[in-house]
Design a protein with these regions (language model features):
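Juxtamembrane loop-to-helix connectors within ABC transporter transmembrane domains
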Residues: 4, 82, 102-147, 204
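An intracellular "coupling" helix at the cytosolic face of ABC transporter transmembrane type-1 domains
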Residues: 5-9, 106, 123-131, 183-184, ...
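Transmembrane helix-loop-helix hairpins at lipid-water interfaces of multipass membrane proteins
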Residues: 15-70, 153-158, 267-270
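A hydrophobic transmembrane-helix motif
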Residues: 28-33, 70, 136-178, 234-277
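Cytosolic ends of transmembrane helices, especially the final helix of ABC transmembrane type-1 domains
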Residues: 210-214, 238, 283-310, 320
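Helix-to-loop junction immediately C-terminal to a conserved catalytic motif
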Residues: 379
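ABC ATPase nucleotide-binding domain helical subdomain, centered on the C-loop/LSGGQ "ABC signature"
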Residues: 390, 398, 423-464, 517, ...
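ABC-family ATPase nucleotide-binding domain "signature/switch" substructure
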Residues: 409, 414, 425, 444-445, ...
Length: 570
């Protein structure tokens, strides 16, 4: 539970002391008032509070009023502290989890299931909030109960100890039920994560559902997910809900046992017995709260444990950040670079090559051949399993990741936009990027004329799915985003694969203009995209099968030659 409670022992301790003080005030009030009631019945002016200490009836009433005021004040303070404690813990946990994820390496992030982060930040964190509330309630109730029991023992030791012993004995009978609550909590946590990831996957098929008319089948799949998750939640809630009724039944049996014990011991102090029974009945409510808190913690703990595991995984997966400045990127060299995923599946085998400064290089090859992995290595998203990658003769793994990200940028095949304006999407949270730099990047990407035609200009709102922009405009916006910090190496993945003729022409024009100022690497399946390349490399089965000029490669490499033929370019 360290992710939620951590080093907050001082706050919990303050709540415990406050609850103990509140419990003592309540216990003393119950003793004084119960004995005052017996004094009125017996028509006496003096009452015994604890031991031989006596008070007048009026004094007892004043003490009772004082105890009410003290208890109310302490309870209000505890409520304020508890609510502040709970909300701050949840907020801090969400910040910590989000930061750990965002700074985790790309391989760690990519290994997450769809919707996992959202589920951790919502359902799992809310369960953590419930756990924190349960812990604070349990601590408060426990110390209030201790205060009440202490007062009861001081008033009538025999009856109080009998009740306490019976309550502990009966309470131990609930241990198997609490274990069942925890097991069902684990099942519910796993079901919730599966529901979130599966639903996220389905939600991404919106267009396909309409195209293939599979709404009924998708609805059935969602229904199965809902039913499975609901069943797990129902079993957990049932196990939680029966803890308190069972405890109450056992506690009442303990009170009956106490009466029997007092009768056997021939206790004759009726006033003391009445005070003890009143305290014990009040203590029963605290006992119920403790049992309720315990079962709630048992149900929420699996969620919190899973959240802690993921948080530790994100932190452990934080990518190493070199300290050396990048300086000039220059030539990019790969020396015997190999890469294997965690399942030991090798996707690149001893790739060696050099991409010269201001050279335009194409990458082609069959799907699954290793092109995407090679690009991720160049971007610094992954580190080679063997070999090295050098920029201007220096290992990029030793360089600052932040500076490398400004010098080496990427345009993905699919545009990813955020809710905001056109300017917001070009800037993309980089607060140091000026409006002048944004306008310059838009001109380089041949997007400025389109923006000028918008009534709102750069303030035109753009949805996360690209609303208000065509596909070509979205792609050019992503190109402007990549150019806004004046990179030295630009990598593009299928930049024109799904564009109209005009947008494709504009992007090709941009690349021709940029080739005079920076190194460009283009991953492409469409051979027409590569006619601006100085050299082209062929990646097949994780190996570099060819790296030469287009004319030489068409004669020496069978894959490239066949691709040109199939494209009608040869």
């Amino acid at each position: 539970m360290k992710v939620f409670l951590g080093a907050r022992g001082r706050t919990i301790g303050a709540l415990a002391l406050t609850s103990f003080g509140s419990g003592m005030a309540e216990a003393l009030f119950l003793v004084v008032i119960s004995r005052a009631a017996f004094a009125v019945t017996d028509d006496v002016d003096q009452i015994r509070v604890i031991g031989d200490r006596s008070l007048s009836l009026g004094g007892a009433i004043l003490i009772g009023l004082s105890m009410i005021a003290i208890r109310c004040g302490l309870a209000l303070w505890a409520a304020a502290q508890s609510s502040r404690f709970s909300t701050s813990v949840v907020a801090d946990t969400r910040r910590t989890l989000a930061e750990a994820f965002l700074f985790a390496s790309w391989p760690v992030q990519q290994s997450d299931r769809s919707g996992q982060l959202q589920e951790l930040l919502t359902t799992f964190t809310n369960q953590g909030s419930q756990l924190v509330n349960s812990v604070t309630l349990g601590v408060s109730s426990t110390f209030s109960l201790i205060a009440l029991l202490g007062m009861a023992v001081a008033v009538n030791p025999v009856g109080s100890l009998v009740v306490l012993a019976a309550a502990l004995a009966f309470g131990s009978l609930l241990r198997p039920l609490r274990s069942a609550v925890r097991r069902r909590g684990t099942t519910a946590a796993n079901a919730g994560m599966h529901f979130a990831s599966s639903l996220t996957s389905l939600s991404q098929l919106g267009q396909e559902m309409h195209i293939f008319r599979i709404q009924k089948q998708a609805t059935s799949a969602v229904d199965e997910l809902v039913t499975s998750s609901a069943d797990a939640e129902r079993r957990l809630l049932f196990a939680r809900s029966i803890v308190v009724p069972l405890y109450s039944t056992l506690a009442y049996l303990a009170l009956i046992g106490a009466l029997a014990g007092i009768t056997i011991s021939n206790a004759t102090n009726v006033a003391a017995l009445g005070a003890v029974m009143l305290i014990m009945l009040r203590a029963l409510s605290y006992g119920q709260a403790i049992q309720n808190a315990h079962s709630s913690v048992a149900g929420s703990l699996p969620f919190v444990e899973r959240l802690q595991v993921e948080l530790d995984r994100y932190r452990a997966g934080r990518q190493y950040d070199g300290q050396q400045p990048v300086g000039h990127v220059g030539d990019l060299t790969l020396n015997d670079v190999s890469f294997s995923y965690e399942d030991e599946r090798r996707v690149l085998h001893e790739v060696s090559l050099t991409i010269h400064h201001k050279e335009v290089v194409g990458i082609v090859g069959p799907s699954g051949g290793g092109k995407s992995t090679l690009v991720q290595l160049m971007l610094g998203l992954r580190d080679p399993s063997a070999g090295s990658i050098l920029a201007a003769g220096r290992p990029i793994i030793e360089m600052s990741r932040d500076e490398w990200a400004r010098k080496v940028t990427f345009v993905p095949q699919e545009a990813h936009l955020v809710a905001g304006t056109v300017a917001d999407n070009i800037r993309l949270f980089r607060d140091d990027v000026s409006m002048e730099a944004i306008e310059r990047a838009a001109r380089l990407a041949h997007l400025s004329d389109d923006i000028a035609s918008f009534p709102e200009g750069y303030d035109r709102p753009v949805g996360e799915l690209g609303g208000h922009l065509s596909g070509g405009q979205q792609q050019r916006l992503c190109l402007a985003r990549a150019l806004v910090e004046r990179p030295e190496l630009l990598i593009l993945d299928e930049p024109t694969s799904s564009l109209d003729v005009r947008s494709e022409h504009l992007i090709r024009q941009t690349l021709v203009e940029l080739s005079k100022h920076m190194t460009i690497v283009i991953v492409a399946h469409r051979m027409s995209t590569l006619d601006i390349c100085d050299r082209i490399m062929v990646i097949q089965e994780g190996r570099l099968k060819g790296f030469d000029t287009p004319s030489q490669l068409s004669e020496s490499n069978a894959f490239y030659s066949e691709a040109l033929t199939l494209s009608g370019l040869k």
